[in-house]
Amino acid sequence: MDLLDVDYWDVLEKKWGMHYFNDIYNVMLIDLIEEEKENGFSVLEIGCDCGATLLEIKNRFPKAEVYGSEINVASAGIASHVANVVVNNIEEENLPFPERKFDYIIFGDVLEHLHNPLKTVVYCQRFLRENGHIIASIPNIQHISVMEGLMQGDFTYMESGLLDKTHIHFFTYNEIVRMFHEAGYEICSLKGSGVPISDRQNELIDQLLALEGRAQRFMYIAFQYNLKAKMRKDVES
């Protein structure tokens, strides 16, 4: 069977709830792990899918201990071949790991799918070691493609992308900063990554920036934000 055949991926989604991007690792998040190749450290990925990101972490850092939490049983079964994986709904707050176990906890396009992402990132503090980090990729609802639709009165959910029909929460740069500050984190890095935009969209950004407000150009260009954060000293226990 041709793995590029759309029907193949439709079958996987309908039968197993798996998507084509489940086996693509997130290079931008992995690049936020600042460790020497021979260092030993522990990583937990929330929503690890089929384990592609954890596998690439293990390839880059052979001494890393990799763990995953995944709600989809079929995906977790595949990921278990490369990591210690538990079938778990993170919002139920019952991770079976000891406190202060992990140097990194990863949320790769996960927080937008949660009913209470603030509560979840607070809950995960107990599993971070001293100087441990949260690493996350979060889609940007302020991207110019969404703003362009709103100007036409459209906010139509899609099968994937910024308006993915499974998204429960939406984030802008300011909302990400606000949530992690409220949760007790210090943001070490928060950078946008983008996709090409048209000349017309660039013109729209110029028009939006001419309006009164605090928005900056990057807030309309970033398709998603990649974050690295650690617990603030005043909230560590």
Annotate each language-model stretch with its function:
Residues 104-110:
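A short beta-strand submotif of the Rossmann-like class I SAM-dependent methyltransferase core
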Residues 1-100, 104, 118-121, 152, ...:
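Conserved N-terminal segment of class I S-adenosyl-L-methionine
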Residues 119-133:
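A short glycine-rich, Lys/Arg-flanked "PGG" loop and its adjoining helix->strand segment in the class I
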Residues 135-157:
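Conserved class I S-adenosyl-L-methionine
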Residues 158-175:
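Acceptor-substrate binding/catalytic loop of class I
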Residues 91-93, 111, 142:
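Adenine-nucleotide cofactor-binding loop residues
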Residues 176-191:
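A SAM-dependent methyltransferase catalytic signature shared across enzymes that methylate proteins
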